[in-house]
Amino acid sequence: MHEPEVAWLALEQENAAAFPILRRFSRNERHTASWQDFQLGRPEAEDFIRRWRDDPHTLTPYCLDRRSRSLLFVETAPGVDLCTVHPFFYQAQRLCAIRLHSVPMPVVLAMARDLPATLEQLILIHSTGRCGSTLLTQLLQTQGDMVTVSEPDLYTQLIHLPQQDALELAPVIRAATLFLRASLARNGYMALKMRGVVTYRAAMLAEALPGARSIFMYRHAADVVNSFITTMVPPWQFRLERALGIERLPTRWLMPSQSTLRLAPLLADRSYQATGLVGFFTMAWLSKMEAALAFQEQVGLAATLRYEALRRDPGGTLERLATALGLAGDLQPAALEKALGKDAQQGSSMASRQVRVLDQHDERRLRRLLAHHPRLNQPDVVLPGGLEP
């Protein structure tokens, strides 16, 4: 029997177990975290309660495993700062993990009762994606006692589940968040910057994490679409596909899987007639904007933030955001200047290429799609709750 099969059988057991990591598999950074990111050795039963009490700062929640009804933690060597090793937290976890711990959900829930339960110092950052939200997390670190975590993938898993299943996991998500906070933030503020698609589960997270404050960041639709395309395919490939007419094909033909609808739910509405990559990423932008608008009106966001405002007036925008969030830290101009002077995702495959591939025809297609929406019908629409004076 191969080692991964032995490991999988152990994951189905009821007790906590620790697995040595024999190998890390190469994963695209768009991949969602999973135990399958690793080749695991033979497991050893463990007392996870004691292990956590001995050294909680080397253990962080990595992902859920629904089949075994476990929360999986990665263990790293002492002194590793997962918030600085890589622009994305889930990638830092994968790169630095030395062991994987499988902890049954009942044990997780029981242990969480002994963790500090307050979530008033927790900030949830939702966004359209490709809009400067990673930069925002770096700017927030200039606000005194703040730990920022960029894209912990535990939350990304929720979009792959039916709404009811995600709701049933709310207690586990809350417990996992308390573990993450206890491991990284101790008693200070913690900001969790989610992948853009997690916006579709913003209401569920607000219910699971009472006291946390949510913000939403966005950007001009054409800039977001352009940035997504240039990180997904080489510019020459997109231009070639456009010249060959592939961009005129319906998006549902090019991306027919159910997972596509999870990324851009409004694609289910055939009246939009989306075509090509431009159509897909326009509908993804619109879907997230619609989800954020609904959340703002039904639950309430602490603030909405436009990338253009942040770039135009970073100091003033950050001051207003700090006020909206109740932060007490002082601005550090040198740290602000340093963060603004580099690509926040430098070192990852998602780093911006700074290339414009959309032409005037593409932007007209984008505007025609948006024109179908009753409220979000302009690429530079401004959401309520903004921070601009």
Predicted regions and their residues:
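PAPS-dependent sulfation machinery
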Residues: 82, 121, 128, 138-199, ...
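A short acidic (Asp/Glu
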Residues: 135, 200-206, 225-229, 314-318
